[in-house]
Amino acid sequence: MVKRTVATNGDASGAHRAKKMSKTHASHIINAQEDYKHMYLSVQPLDIFCWGTGSMCELGLGPLAKNKEVKRPRLNPFLPRDEAKIISFAVGGMHTLALDEESNVWSWGCNDVGALGRDTSNAKEQLKDMDADDSSDDEDGDLNELESTPAKIPRESFPPLAEGHKVVQLAATDNMSCALFSNGEVYAWGTFRCNEGILGFYQDKIKIQKTPWKVPTFSKYNIVQLAPGKDHILFLDEEGMVFAWGNGQQNQLGRKVMERFRLKTLDPRPFGLRHVKYIASGENHCFALTKDNKLVSWGLNQFGQCGVSEDVEDGALVTKPKRLALPDNVVIRSIAAGEHHSLILSQDGDLYSCGRLDMFEVGIPKDNLPEYTYKDVHGKARAVPLPTKLNNVPKFKSVAAGSHHSVAVAQNGIAYSWGFGETYAVGLGPFEDDTEVPTRIKNTATQDHNIILVGCGGQFSVSGGVKLSDEDAEKRADEMDD
């Protein structure tokens, strides 16, 4: 069902088309090879909040049927800050991974193909009486107890921990999971899907991997960053070489894959992109920033989500890494992307977006669209195909993208959301309408928190924050009222 983004640390240092953007200089970014840990790890334990639709146990709020829909952020009672001590998490399409201070990996959500990395087959499931007055198709019983409740993956599943190495990043796609260790090793579990169903996990040898497994390809490389998509994942090594693994039917692996050779993609391999210092993935498209400060993208581009051209057409592909244009002197902080939209956050807190408009994915008001907005044959605005700065919004420090919604954290620690609203993943309450522009998430649970990390799945969202002192909370509230 869709994209996920790793949580990013907000505290880390035929149709009408208009004129083309002027040529600009390349952007810059923090050196991921030096500072990548800071992007994904909080310096202190977090309260964890979850919201949206959790019919596949995505919310991690326990097995009761009432937890299938949560319309505003809710504190996760199974991850108390002073006990669980969660410092990071990664959100997949229908599951979430979390990391605690001791490098234990927690998981919850859908485990149909082993994405949780632990056995949930003996869970108790209690179904409601289907003749009961309150029964319905949507709430016909409780959830799988072991999938809907956060739990640790057995520590012995990760041999590097016994050698003193720590987990420095987690990553989750729709159907698989990864853990990156401080020694550059990668452990993975789950599987990859393609248009026809399950593609497989590793070569033609493993179809589904239900427990963490050391990826042998990286025994001779030191991996420093992971970038998960829907059914693919990118890896960056310390020399700046990018590897790709998984489904490549939309060119997301950076190379053309012949149908008869598609199992060849089930082994991580480089595809010629080198001298890179930062990587990011959407569901079926990708980004990389080179060491000479060129931001490039590739993959599926039918709504301009790659941000490289005004040409928008159904099934369009960017077949090899192509450079994006951004305003002069932009320093990139992070990139998040969903199925058909992309978000680029600058170190100054400015947010640029490109991609689909139908569900307000880009967060740009329809009465202020740029002149290069793509319109269909009926004159309806459908996409913004080039990175465009969002105006009249706060300065942000962190951003995450789900399939068709996004969450961003302002520099004062308050979360904002926009996009597809029917699944309540925007966290704005009982309203099911799509949200046009970044809108403050207001609720009692998070009103006194400094939100640090955010992540988005297919139909849900997760955030992590630290409670402010009474004085700081009051000060922020006064500033917001001004």
From Swiss-Prot:
Changing residue 282 to S: Leads to temperature-dependent mislocalization of nucleoporins (nups) and the pore-membrane protein POM152. Residues 1-11 have a biased composition (Polar residues). It holds the Pfam family WD40_RLD. Residues 1-22, 128-158 are annotated as: Disordered. The keyword Coiled coil does not apply. Induction: By pheromone. InterPro entries: Ran_GTPase-activating, RCC1/BLIP-II, Reg_chr_condens. The modification Phosphoserine is found at residues 135-136. It comes from the Eukaryota. It is found in: Nucleus. Residues 131-145 have a biased composition (Acidic residues). RCC1 repeats lie at residues 45-101, 103-152, 183-238, 239-291, 292-347, 349-411, 412-466. One of its GO terms (biological process) is poly(A)+ mRNA export from nucleus. One of its GO terms (molecular function) is guanyl-nucleotide exchange factor activity. Guanine nucleotide exchange factor that promotes the exchange of GSP1/GSP2-bound GDP by GTP and controls RNA metabolism and transport. Involved in yeast pheromone response pathway and in mRNA metabolism. Involved in nuclear pore complex (NPC) assembly and required for mRNA and ribosome nuclear export. Binds chromatin and is involved NPC-mediated transcriptional control. Component of a multicomponent complex composed of six to seven proteins, which has a collective molecular mass greater than 150 kDa. Interacts with GSP1 and YRB2. This is Guanine nucleotide exchange factor SRM1. It comes from Saccharomyces cerevisiae (strain ATCC 204508 / S288c) (Baker's yeast).
